[in-house]
Amino acid sequence: HEEAGALWRALAEGEGEGVVSGLSLVELLRLGLKGALAKEDAELLLQAIPAVCRVVWPDWTTGERAARLSHGLYLPLVDALVLATALEAGARELWTTDADLGRYEGKLRVVLLR
């Protein structure tokens, strides 16, 4: 995705702030372990992402918000936790390959990567 590549380069150069849910990193690890993502690619991403993005783990407040989002938008809980983490962190955009998150309409823009 061209726009995602440009955003990544900007973050790597210190322009703006990226935020990533710790759960997204765990998901990358899982994908690497099960072979859905090449192990080397997963390892590279797991090193690179925290180097340029602030890693945020959900707390109870985020969990409560996620439960409501999951219920209201019919999202799987992990997806709702990622969304709630972005909202609690004050993110303006959420970049994702998860089409389910496209159902969210609100304070942040969901960018679906295809």
Task: For each feature predicted by the language model, list its residue ranges.
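Short, well-structured N-terminal submotif of metal-dependent ribonuclease cores
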Residues: H1-V20, G32-Q47, A99, L112-R114
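Active-site neighborhoods of divalent-metal-dependent phosphate/nucleic-acid chemistry enzymes
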Residues: R54-T97
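Short strand-turn motif at the edge of the Rossmann-like AdoMet-binding core
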Residues: L23
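Short glycine/serine- and small hydrophobic-enriched flexible loop segments
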Residues: R30-L33, L87
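Internal alpha/beta domain cores that form substrate/cofactor-binding pockets in large enzymes
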Residues: L46-Q47, R54, P58, L73-Y74, ...
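Acidic, PIN/NYN-like endoribonuclease modules and their adjacent C-terminal/linker elements
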Residues: A10, L83-R114
